[in-house]
């Protein structure tokens, strides 16, 4: 399973020092470099330097203003790449496209034209040698973008924003995870640890190199495999007999729902997305153990 790293994304509204974020537990930083074809974050250089000084991994993002215009998207991407090169952003890291409503960026055009423009931007960055990803809110990605097409081309590359509640959140509550395919990172709050910065958690290993020496891991101890229970019971939850529980497949993709007040034979046990799950059928039918009771 991929390492779950806390990641912060910073722009002109945040400090030039990453020390507080590092102290709170962040391991990676995404610095806003550019917007449109003329704006450069005046704090970017100092934020990049502080990220390195604090021995954190560095990525960068660009705020789109091209809407569904593929030609304009290429121009913005070239501007973004030029700035990334000037700041020596490693090609082992990600260049993210922030495509959302704001500053003239229109998202309500057809999903087809939106996707074409987004992919034109990503191609320029990819051709320049960088890893690429797409950021937006869960609703926009579901309604206004053909994410399946993007995932087919670039793999698991979505950075999705979806908050359980507004205000300070220190740790993600995966009961509110925006279930969709291709999610590499989840932005779960805009006020992580009360620091006034967006908080994100990785679901994919974004750092796959050894550019910086990783902390030594203790030797693995042999752990006895958990005994597989024979039957699990899914009780009525939250006092609502109509509440249903969503299953996952073995790779962590959400599947169909099952009724509560039901019994299931258990065929296996494994950790999926950090949750203990029971296999109650095929490899696409794993139920989170937290919603069940074991019946002997």
Language-model regions: role of each:
Residues 91-173:
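Catalytic domains of cell-wall/extracellular-matrix polysaccharide-remodeling enzymes
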Residues 37, 80, 112, 137-142, ...:
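Peptidoglycan cell-wall recognition and remodeling modules
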Residues 220-279, 284-296:
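Beta-loop motif signature
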Residues 38, 67, 141, 167, ...:
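Flexible, glycine-rich phosphate/dinucleotide-binding loops
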């Amino acid at each position: 399973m991929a390492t779950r790293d806390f990641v912060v994304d910073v722009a002109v509204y945040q400090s030039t020092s990453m020390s507080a974020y590092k102290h709170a537990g962040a391991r990676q930083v995404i610095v806003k470099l550019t917007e449109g074809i003329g704006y450069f974050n005046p704090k970017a250089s100092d934020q990049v330097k502080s990220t390195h000084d604090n021995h954190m991994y560095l990525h960068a993002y660009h705020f789109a203003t091209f809407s569904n215009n593929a030609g304009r998207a290429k121009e913005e991407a070239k501007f973004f790449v030029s700035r990334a090169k000037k700041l020596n952003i490693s090609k082992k890291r990600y260049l993210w496209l922030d495509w959302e409503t704001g500053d003239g960026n229109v998202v309500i055009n057809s999903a087809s034209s939106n996707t074409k423009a987004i992919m034109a931007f990503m191609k320029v960055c990819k051709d320049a040698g960088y890893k690429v990803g797409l950021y937006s809110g869960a609703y926009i990605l579901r309604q206004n973008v053909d994410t399946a097409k993007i995932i087919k081309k670039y793999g698991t590359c979505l950075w999705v924003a979806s908050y359980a509640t507004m205000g300070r959140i220190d740790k993600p509550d995966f009961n509110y995870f925006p279930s969709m395919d291709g999610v590499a990172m989840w932005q779960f709050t805009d006020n992580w640890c009360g620091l006034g910065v967006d908080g994100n958690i990785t679901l994919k290993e974004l750092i796959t190199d050894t550019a910086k020496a990783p902390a030594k891991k203790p030797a693995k101890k042999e752990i006895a495999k958990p005994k597989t229970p024979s039957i699990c019971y899914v009780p009525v939850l939250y006092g609502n007999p109509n509440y249903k529980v969503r299953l996952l497949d073995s790779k962590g993709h959400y599947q169909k729902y099952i009724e509560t007040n039901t019994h299931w034979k258990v065929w296996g046990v494994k950790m999926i997305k950090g949750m203990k799950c029971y296999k109650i059928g095929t490899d696409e039918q794993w139920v989170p153990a937290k919603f069940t009771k074991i019946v002997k």
